[in-house]
Structure formats: structure tokens, C-alpha cells
């Protein structure tokens, strides 16, 4: 292993762009925005040994690989292990969810790779740890350009407002308290996917940026939201609910922040999801250890600002990170409450299965630590078909048109990154 001062080493993106083009399987997990507690490490990893494509229960299959993971001689949260994603639809292995809608594209339930080359950036310590063979890396060159052309849209304004109205009937009838309904745009894509990531990291820097490449499939995201982190048997999650756009200037920005924090609708929705997160952690944590040390504060990103809370607990000794995954998946912030009923309503009202949207992207470390972000604010590229996808939380007093515009606010950075309006 080599150690370098971060000031003498190229940025994670500059290094990754030299690596990505030479390998079919590679990943960049980059922290470049948001609060320091979320943005400490960046990880570059690639594999010369292929990857795992999972068409069955991801937790059962990944558990079979945990015992064989080799600990890498590097500090930080990721000490070698598995990097990848889990699709939203994998929840059917853990909850009784109806199977009514077609897939938008052909995605497996999960894909993971075990990297044999790893570079870790510790932004707090100012060091770069290299556990990789860089002799096989070719020249860097420039990032290519790309072209997109509109393909289709799932749930236009009228259709989305209609399903929001239908979901309000479920809420008023007492079936659920909240449901998160999503919609998407798709485009025909040609060119260099890395250019999308380059644009996105400039437009919408976030603590959970990622670029995962599995041959002809890519997940390119700038998620603000952690699904969970396990570090030394402490489990953390940071539910986000309640959103406003950023203001044109400081005065307008503060006005929108105060409007958000004074909104009874947004606060009620947020508290509901904090309770859901507490309940999820309670399934796998030692009784009495689940706490909310920070309740309802605002975090600001390039295009939006959110209400956030922190929920923690101590993991029971008989459980591991994959148990935490199945207990928390999918996040209440992308499904609703109660979760199983909300997800069945999603399956009824949305036009397609979600695939990797609203699933999870991250890693399981060989020492038992793990970190997964929610796959939102993400472009999903499957061969030539590019999808951008966003949802809004519907509660008792939701206005259908306002919820439509919330999805558009959440899509704004992605639309800018791919050059569409």
C-alpha cells in the first residue's frame, strides 16, 4: 500500500477517468458536497475478475460471499469487500408486494463486484491510500461528449396528478399515512456516460455521488440521502423528508427555509418517516439503543434544501449489515408508511416497476462495516436507454399539482446534467 498527501494527488474524478475506460467493471463513490460527517471518504475501485449479477434474493446470495471477503490493508470505512447496487424490486423477497407491472428496462435484482484494486481518499485526514496496480492503467485522454433524444415519459402532469388524487383516497380511507409516487423520463443515449457524471458533480455536488459501471449498465448519481451506515456495530440513518428549491439569493433562500420549517404538512411527513426509521432500526438493534440525537434540521444542496434527522442504534451481535439492509429497505422516504401497504399502492398506481430507482448503492466492507445511499437523483443507463426518475411524498393534505412540481424540482439537476429541459 502507498500513502500520499491528498494535495499531491489528482482528484478522485481525475484518477477515475484514467481508469474507467480500460475496465468493464469499475466504481467511483465520491463525497464532494454536504456536511463533513457525510463527506469524509471517496473510493475508486475496479475489478479484473468480472462481477456478480443477481436474479434471486440478494441478501441470501451476498451472505454466501461474506465469509470469503479479504480484508485490504487500508484504513477507513471500506477495507475491501463488495461494491454494487440493489434494485427497489428486490423488496419482494422480504415483503409481500404484488407483481402487477412490467419492468421499464432489464435490470437484475442486484449487481456487485469484489474489487482487486482500491484507492481511498480520506478528505478529513488529507491522505490518499493506494492499494492498486496502476501499471495496467492506460493514458487518460479527454472525456467524450454525448447526445440524448427524448424517448418517452411515464406519468405526464395530468396522469401524475390523477394518481396523486387516487392515492389521497387510500389515505383518507385509512389504508396508509403516506405514499411516495414517482415518475420518469427516458432518452436514447449515445456517447460517453462519464460526461454525465462530470456534469452532475459540477451542477449538484453531494455527499453520495457514484458512478458504477457493470459492462453496458451504469448508475450515475448524486444522492443526498443515506439509507444506512454500519460502523463498529453502530447503525446510522438520516431520513430526509420535506423539500424546497434553493433561492435565487440569500434572502430568498432563507425565506424558503423558514417556509419549509414552518410547514405543518412537511413536519408531519418528516416525523412520520423518523418514526418509520426508528421502527426499522428496532428490528436489528439492541432494545433501548435506538435514539434520535438530531431532530429536524435543514441541509442545503445545489438545487434543493431538505429537512433531515439522525437516527442511530447498536446492532445486535447476531446480525450483520445485510440484516440491516433487509430491515431498512427500501427507505420510508421513497416508499411511504406503513411500508408494505404503501408499496402495494405504488405497484398499483405507477406504470412500471422501478428497477434500481429508489434502491440502494454502496458497499459492504470485509470487516463488517457498510454504507448504502438511496438511489435517487440518479441517471440509469441500460445500453442505449437513459432514465431519470423522481418521486414526491403524498400525505393527507397534499396538492396534486404541487407534488408534480416537487418531482420536477428533484429532476432539475439531472435534466441540466444531460442537457434537456
Curated annotation (Swiss-Prot):
Pfam families: Anth_synt_I_N, Chorismate_bind. Keywords: Allosteric enzyme, Amino-acid biosynthesis, Aromatic amino acid biosynthesis, Lyase, Magnesium, Metal-binding, Tryptophan biosynthesis. L-tryptophan binds at residues 31, 207-209. Chorismate binds at residues 242-243, 357, 377, 391-393. GO terms for biological process: L-tryptophan biosynthetic process. Cooperatively feedback inhibited by tryptophan. SUPFAM superfamilies: ADC synthase. GO terms for molecular function: anthranilate synthase activity; metal ion binding. Mg(2+) binds at residues 269, 406. The keyword Lyase applies. Coiled coil: none annotated. Its EC number is 4.1.3.27. Transmembrane segments: none annotated. Pathway: Amino-acid biosynthesis; L-tryptophan biosynthesis; L-tryptophan from chorismate: step 1/5. It catalyses: chorismate + L-glutamine = anthranilate + pyruvate + L-glutamate + H(+). NCBIfam families: PRK13574.1, TrpE-arch. Belongs to the anthranilate synthase component I family. This is Anthranilate synthase component 1. It comes from Saccharolobus solfataricus (strain ATCC 35092 / DSM 1617 / JCM 11322 / P2) (Sulfolobus solfataricus). The gene is trpE.
Amino acid at each position: 500500500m502507498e500513502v500520499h498527501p491528498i494535495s499531491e494527488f489528482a482528484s478522485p474524478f481525475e484518477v477515475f477517468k484514467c481508469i474507467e475506460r480500460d475496465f468493464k467493471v469499475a466504481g467511483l463513490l465520491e463525497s464532494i458536497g454536504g456536511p463533513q460527517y457525510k463527506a469524509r471518504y471517496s473510493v475508486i475501485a475496479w475489478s479484473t475478475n468480472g462481477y456478480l449479477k443477481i436474479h434471486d434474493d440478494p441478501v441470501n446470495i451476498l451472505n454466501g460471499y461474506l465469509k470469503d471477503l479479504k480484508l485490504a490493508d487500508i484504513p477507513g470505512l471500506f477495507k475491501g469487500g463488495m461494491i454494487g447496487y440493489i434494485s427497489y424490486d428486490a423488496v419482494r423477497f422480504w415483503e409481500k408486494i404484488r407483481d402487477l407491472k412490467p419492468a421499464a428496462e432489464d435490470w437484475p435484482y442486484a449487481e456487485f463486484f469484489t474489487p482487486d484494486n482500491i484507492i481511498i481518499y480520506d478528505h478529513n485526514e488529507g491522505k490518499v491510500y493506494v492499494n492498486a496496480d496502476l501499471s495496467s492503467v492506460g493514458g487518460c485522454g479527454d472525456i467524450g461528449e454525448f447526445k440524448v433524444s427524448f424517448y418517452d415519459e411515464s406519468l405526464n402532469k395530468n396522469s401524475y396528478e390523477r394518481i396523486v388524487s387516487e392515492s389521497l383516497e387510500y389515505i383518507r380511507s385509512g389504508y396508509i399515512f403516506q405514499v411516495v409516487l414517482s415518475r420518469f423520463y427516458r432518452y436514447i443515449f449515445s456517447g460517453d456516460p462519464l460526461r454525465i457524471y462530470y456534469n452532475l458533480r459540477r451542477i449538484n455536488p453531494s455527499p453520495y455521488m457514484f458512478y458504477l459501471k457493470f459492462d453496458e449498465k451504469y448508475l450515475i448519481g448524486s444522492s443526498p440521502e443515506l439509507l444506512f451506515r454500519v460502523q463498529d456495530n453502530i447503525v446510522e440513518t438520516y431520513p430526509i423528508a420535506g423539500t424546497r428549491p434553493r433561492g435565487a439569493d440569500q434572502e430568498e433562500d432563507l425565506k424558503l427555509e423558514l417556509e419549509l420549517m414552518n410547514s405543518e404538512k412537511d413536519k408531519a411527513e418528516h416525523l412520520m418517516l423518523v418514526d418509520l426509521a426508528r421502527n426499522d432500526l428496532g428490528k436489528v438493534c439492541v432494545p433501548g439503543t435506538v435514539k434520535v440525537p438530531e431532530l429536524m434540521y435543514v441541509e442545503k444542496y445545489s438545487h434543493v434544501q431538505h429537512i433531515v434527522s439522525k437516527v442511530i442504534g447498536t446492532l445486535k451481535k447476531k446480525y450483520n449489515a445485510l440484516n440491516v439492509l433487509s430491515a431498512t429497505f427500501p427507505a420510508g422516504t421513497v416508499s411511504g408508511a406503513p411500508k408494505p401497504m404503501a408499496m402495494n399502492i405504488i405497484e398499483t398506481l405507477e406504470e412500471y416497476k422501478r428497477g434500481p430507482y429508489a434502491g440502494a448503492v454502496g458497499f459492504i466492507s470485509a470487516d463488517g462495516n457498510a454504507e448504502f445511499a438511496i438511489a435517487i437523483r440518479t441517471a440509469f443507463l441500460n445500453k442505449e436507454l437513459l432514465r431519470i426518475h423522481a418521486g414526491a411524498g403524498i400525505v393527507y393534505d397534499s396538492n396534486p399539482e404541487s407534488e408534480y412540481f416537487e418531482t420536477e424540482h428533484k429532476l432539475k439537476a439531472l435534466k441540466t446534467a444531460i442537457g434537456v429541459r
